[in-house]
């Protein structure tokens, strides 16, 4: 929803807001694997923690991520986009794919902290520690080690 809000703001300011959705649910491993990973994260020793976020996916699926971001900029090229003034994605992989394809990104826009649910903190902390864009400092190793996710029977 935040990305759509950014698009609306750009259009209201006389620019263009563009939403491009690439279906890659659960790091392109699919919905079933995504839910198996969620279940494994809650059941692991020590609970759901950011420090083991990517490891759980690898234990369940054999890989951490199956997305191939290098193809993602093709849609922008087809539409004639050469510059993005406000990029509403925190993904370092998507940003890297865009810039490697010659598309300039002027400003990166993070999801505002107040829009991140408490039970999504594990995912966001793991991703920012792994290189996702954040205007703040990424979490420390000590912060990543804390159990922060929902309990199995909560």
Q: Language-model segments: which ranges?
A:
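Catalytic domains of riboflavin
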Residues: 1-154
């Amino acid at each position: 929803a935040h990305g759509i809000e950014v698009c609306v703001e750009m259009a209201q300011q006389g620019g263009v807001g563009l939403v491009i959705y690439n279906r890659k649910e659960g790091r392109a491993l699919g919905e079933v694997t995504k839910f198996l990973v969620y279940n494994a994260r809650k059941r692991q020793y020590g609970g759901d923690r950011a420090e083991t976020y990517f490891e759980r996916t690898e234990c369940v699926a054999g890989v951490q991520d199956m997305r191939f971001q290098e193809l993602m900029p093709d849609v922008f090229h087809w539409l004639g986009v050469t510059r993005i003034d406000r990029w509403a994605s925190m993904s370092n992989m998507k940003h890297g794919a865009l810039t490697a394809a010659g598309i300039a990104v002027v400003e990166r826009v993070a999801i505002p902290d107040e829009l991140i649910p408490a039970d999504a903190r594990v995912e966001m902390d793991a991703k920012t520690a792994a290189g996702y864009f954040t205007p703040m400092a990424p979490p420390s190793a000590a912060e990543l080690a804390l159990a922060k996710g929902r309990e199995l029977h909560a």
